[in-house]
């Protein structure tokens, strides 16, 4: 599914463009990723978020 609305992380404005019209920074998708209990990559995302190497 392609998201249309985007959000600027600097000034928190919403737009449909890839570049923020207010400050010129790159916009991001404001929606969280879809959750799945059978997610194979959850340990890697936790490792990346916390900055700790997990022993797998």
UniProtKB/Swiss-Prot annotation:
Keyword Membrane listed: no
Highest taxon of the lineage: Archaea
Short name of any one Pfam family annotated for the protein: Nop10p
GO CC field: ribonucleoprotein complex
Keywords: Ribonucleoprotein, Ribosome biogenesis, rRNA processing
InterPro entries from the UniProt entry: H/ACA_rnp_Nop10, H/ACA_rnp_Nop10_sf, Nop10_arc-typ
GO annotation terms (biological process): pseudouridine synthesis; rRNA processing
Molecular function as annotated in GO: snoRNA binding
Signal peptide: none
Function: Involved in ribosome biogenesis; more specifically in 18S rRNA pseudouridylation and in cleavage of pre-rRNA.
Family: Belongs to the NOP10 family.
Protein name: Ribosome biogenesis protein Nop10
